[in-house]
Amino acid sequence: MNPEYDYLFKLLLIGDSGVGKSCLLLRFADDSYLDSYISTIGVDFKIRTVEQDGKTIKLQIWDTAGQERFRTITSSYYRGAHGIIVTYDVTDLESFNNVKQWLNEIDRYASENVNKLLVGNKCDLTSQKVVSTETAKAFADELGIPFLETSAKNATNVEEAFMAMTAAIKTRMASQPAGGSKPPTVQIRGQPVNQQSGCCSS
């Protein structure tokens, strides 16, 4: 057991290109914001350790590229994820309409009980908003997914989004039978996964 943390959670940020996934990650992990937009090539990740209910939780947050051409690369990163934050841009209707497609990706590649959170980013751009809070909330409620509107630019609800996801995963892990207290060890039907047999060896 690593004494530095009690839990290690892998989180994914997914959604269309340009919705602000990298900005959300930068705001949460480094409390910084970049106005200039640089498209993420492939996958990038950051780590932040948080305290919750007296437990130290290490969050490994992966920023997956939104472009269609990277879909095959990022599909492997769904595996092993504890939580997935599906992000859209409140000023871009297409990015919201594509949320269904991203949820299909989750159903296809992620584990069955993975935690999900719907996030509408760029809520500071009120005059340009085209996806109403009510529409998004109704959509999320229909699917049984928590929903928050965020702004990476002014930090609105960014901390809340990641901490809510962390709490939900922690609750789920605690309610699971055997092995719940040792999250760094992934168990599949009671068998520890061999750390040596990586899928990247080919």
UniProtKB/Swiss-Prot annotation:
What Pfam families does the record point to?
Ras (PF00071)
Q: Topology relative to the membrane, per the entry?
A: Lipid-anchor
**Principal location listed in the UniProt entry:** membrane
Cite the GO molecular-function annotations of the record: GTP binding; GTPase activity
Chain spans, region Disordered: 174-202
Which segments show compositional bias classed as Polar residues?
192-202
Lipid attachment in record (S-geranylgeranyl cysteine): C199, C200
Q: Which GO terms describe its biological process?
A: pollen development; pollen tube growth; protein transport; vesicle-mediated transport
Q: Which UniProt keywords apply?
A: Cell membrane, ER-Golgi transport, Golgi apparatus, GTP-binding, Lipoprotein, Membrane, Nucleotide-binding, Prenylation, Protein transport, Transport
Binding of GTP, residues: 15-23, 33-40, 63-67, 121-124, 151-153
SUPFAM superfamilies from the UniProt entry: P-loop containing nucleoside triphosphate hydrolases
Q: Where is this motif: Effector region?
A: 37-45
Keyword Oxidoreductase annotated: no
Tell where it localizes.
Cell membrane; Golgi apparatus, trans-Golgi network membrane; Golgi apparatus membrane
Any one cellular-component term (Gene Ontology): Golgi membrane
Q: Which NCBIfam families does the entry link to?
A: small_GTP (TIGR00231)
User: What is the role of the protein in this entry?
Assistant: Protein transport. Regulator of membrane traffic from the Golgi apparatus towards the endoplasmic reticulum (ER).
The family this protein is said to belong to: Belongs to the small GTPase superfamily. Rab family.
Q: What is this protein called?
A: Ras-related protein RABD2c
Q: Which classification does the entry list for the species?
A: Eukaryota, Viridiplantae, Streptophyta, Embryophyta, Tracheophyta
